[in-house]
Amino acid sequence: MNFPWDQLLVKGNWMIISAQIAAPFLVIGLIAVISYFKLWKYLYKEWFTSVDHKKIGIMYLISAVLMFVRGGIDALMLRTQLTIPDNKFLEANHYNEVFTTHGVIMIIFMAMPFIFGLWNVVIPLQLGARDVAFPVMNNVSFWLFFAGMILFNLSFIVGGSPAAGWTNYAPLAGEFSPGPGVNYYLIAIQISGIGSLMTGINFFVTILRCKTPTMKFMQMPMFSVTTFITTLIVILAFPVFTVALALMTADRIFGTQFFTVANGGMPMLWANFFWVWGHPEVYIVILPAFGMYSEIIPTFARKRLFGHQSMIWATAGIAFLSFLVWVHHFFTMGNGALINSFFSISTMLIGVPTGVKLFNWLLTLYKGRITFESPMLFSLAFIPNFLLGGVTGVMLAMASADYQYHNTYFLVAHFHYTLVTGVVFACLAGLIFWYPKMMGYKLNETLNKWCFWFFMIGFNVCFLPQFILGLDGMPRRLYTYMPSDGWWLLNFISTIGAVLMAIGFLFLVASIVYSHIKAPREATGDNWDGLGRTLEWSTASAIPPKYNFAITPDWNDYDTFVDMKEHGRHYLDNHNYKDIHMPNNTPVGFWMGIFMTIGGFFLIFESIVPALICLAGIFITMIWRSFQIDHGYHIPASEVAETEARLREARIKEREAVSHES
């Protein structure tokens, strides 16, 4: 076996060396803590091998928050480098690595698992379902994502990170990027992408087949509707990217020439493949975010969502148009006027259904009895900030004007105004909103609001000046500039904004830690002062029972739960319990994830034999699973009755305590 040992150690500045020294101690420390508290068996049996959608969702969310920290550190490094002219904080290639990993981590390893985590926690509960359609696949999906995440983050200290940008354009990502860096990009995203595709298929079938029988599609909660439409985008878009990654992997490792002009390949083929996936990917993360806003705004406005059916059709329209706009990412790359005109118009058209959504949210707020809890603050801040991102998007959609905006900081500001306000605000709002459903207690609202104000103000301080920098000609991906360029002051202000955002995130961390220690535990399930409007609020808090619902709930309207509460039927209990069938835990996903991680690592360093051995291990695991006779197990009706009796008693005590305090 010829393994390139000389490529393992990354020789760089003090930050890389510090990370290389710290990483082994962090791993050893984590192992020591788990061993000291004797948690290995508990973690393996209750979490790593779990097929409970709620626990898998929490594991996704923990991973996403960790990646938010990693991506945020990258962002602070970028802003520190650009704070003053001719800064020596980062050298050119290290800067390229950092902005590449920042983009990949924030979109693929932060935003997507955040969305998938909330899908797992909320969607089956909103649908009145026991679990997802394919629980074992759900476990496998998570571990494939986790394997890709581990591999990509390993690149910083072992072998070197990719430095060709998050778009990884050929030929820069080919012959001009020697070493394992781009291989990390290709293999890690490929493994994670397979898991994402499996998740899309799983939730597509779950929403079709597992929702409560009386729930019709046009009456589903908006988060479930946007999830269903998003799964269609995942199923259609991810295979394209899977093929593109496989072709570039073949180019780099096996010497094919799909993206090399000299031998009949076509570099622009990669750009088309990437953006046929890449622009729908934006809507893969933003449509579920729209669904979250459509749950949070009616809750704290105490009103029905205005225009529910028009919201569904607008979501479908956005999803359809998302596949017809990819060329707007390279208007300047030599297309003819006819092609640019078509994609310019199709891009502008997306503003129509998006505008419908914005007006529906505003009309939901109109004459509502609004309370300003932190999820609502994020939702309200989203509307004007996202509008600015959308308007600048229409400016960029004009092909002739794009020749001036393209690859400047105007574009950087635009996509951060859409993705941060559209997705990150929603993820933070959704995490706070559904946190009591997962953990049984609310996060501290004072700290949450400090998080909001620092994060929202910091965001605008950071990115609003970048519109001006772009109009003044500052190119994106520029690692330094001269004093004579005149960009110092705005870059300095932008960096201050990034620091404010980091402080805001620290307030959220403080809220999580403080609330874990101090917050009162809640049992009612309808945690936001009884304002919940969908079925997940009818179940117990703190990871609801494995079976979710003791009886199958009825659902006749998208505000059925509000009507149920008005008539005193909000806890879905007729005492007519039956045995409930549930799936068994499985080790398949965990071990496939280990094989994927090890095999992917060897393939990154082009060591084929060990990679093939790990591939064989994956197939053996799948074959072993196929021969297992696993019919699941049943929770006896008597156990269901005991559980429900305990929950009723806890709810009574909680209501009495609230009445006594008032």
UniProtKB/Swiss-Prot annotation:
The protein's enzyme class: oxidoreductase
The UniProt record gives the binding positions of Fe(II)-heme a as H102, H416
Q: Which PROSITE patterns match?
A: COX1, COX1_CUB
Enzyme Commission number(s):
1.10.3.-
GO annotation (BP), single: respiratory electron transport chain
What is this enzyme's catalytic activity, as reactions? 2 a quinol + O2 = 2 a quinone + 2 H2O
Q: How does it sit in the membrane?
A: Multi-pass membrane protein
Q: Drop me one GO molecular function for this one.
A: copper ion binding
Q: Report residues binding heme a3.
A: H414
* Entry's family note: Belongs to the heme-copper respiratory oxidase family.
The role this protein plays is: Catalyzes quinol oxidation with the concomitant reduction of oxygen to water.
UniProt protein name: Probable quinol oxidase subunit 1
Source organism (scientific name): Staphylococcus epidermidis (strain ATCC 35984 / DSM 28319 / BCRC 17069 / CCUG 31568 / BM 3577 / RP62A)
Name of the gene encoding the protein in the UniProt record: qoxB
